[in-house]
């Protein structure tokens, strides 16, 4: 999405810095990508947020807009009344954005600190059937990583934790797929629901040599209106792919 070196602004950054945790969303004919821009450890705010947008998912995208709110794991939520918000970690913190999501127009405030209360991050909001559903990654990024969900009738809460939490977690230390968390719900054009989340495959002595990978499992909705992932069985090592048209993308890079 960021193709020009001057727009990327990666010069002189130390190892492990740069862009973290990108998230994509759609609003009024445009695709929005937001990510954390991790600077070196200087200044008052060294984890800023960027937003780029395009009318096509493959781009070209706009120049990055910088939002000077410290945190990680940004996501954008668009409410029914047209107001737009960004969420960040340290629980689920929220602040309002302007119409084109290039400026912060309110102070950040805490929605909910999570159900597990340990390292809550990766917040995403979904509005469905009159509820705001708040998804969070909790438990740290090791074996205790998990996805929890809470809900409220009002955007600013009070949020009620799901009685089935965590709705995604690997409980078997011997399984190959571990460290499951930071999930985002998506609905296909056929009406089916899925959870996109990160995980790590434990190879040999426990290292995930491919780092964090992307996983997909189905979401079902309980009679009392809660989303659960893969029938609460944890991550699936093999899953039937969604029945959707295939998309062919060509990599035009010379590298």
Predicted feature locations:
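Carbohydrate-active catalytic/glycan-binding domains of CAZyme proteins
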Residues: 1-255
């Amino acid at each position: 999405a960021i193709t020009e070196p001057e727009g990327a602004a990666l010069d002189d950054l130390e190892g492990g810095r740069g862009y973290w945790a990108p998230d994509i969303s759609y609003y009024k004919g445009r695709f929005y990508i937001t990510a954390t821009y991790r600077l070196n450890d200087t200044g008052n705010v060294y984890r800023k947020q960027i937003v780029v947008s395009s009318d096509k998912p493959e781009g070209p995208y706009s120049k990055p807009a910088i939002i000077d709110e410290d945190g990680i794991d940004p996501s954008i939520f668009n409410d029914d009344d047209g107001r737009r918000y960004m969420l960040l970690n340290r629980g689920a913190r929220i602040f309002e954005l302007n119409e084109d999501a290039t400026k912060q127009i309110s102070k950040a405030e805490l929605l909910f600190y999570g159900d597990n209360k340990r390292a809550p991050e990766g917040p995403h909001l979904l509005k469905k059937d009159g509820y705001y559903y708040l998804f969070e990654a909790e438990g740290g990024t090791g074996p205790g990583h998990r996805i929890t969900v809470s809900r409220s009738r009002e955007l600013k809460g009070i949020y009620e934790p799901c009685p089935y939490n965590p709705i995604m977690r690997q409980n078997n230390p011997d399984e190959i797929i571990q460290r499951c968390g930071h999930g985002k719900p998506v609905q296909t054009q056929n009406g089916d629901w899925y959870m996109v989340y990160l995980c790590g495959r434990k190879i040999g002595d426990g290292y995930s040599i491919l780092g964090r990978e992307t996983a997909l499992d189905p979401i079902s909705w309980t009679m009392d209106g809660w989303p659960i992932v893969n029938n609460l069985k944890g991550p699936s090592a093999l899953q039937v792919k969604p029945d959707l048209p295939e998309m062919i993308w060509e990599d035009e890079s010379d590298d």
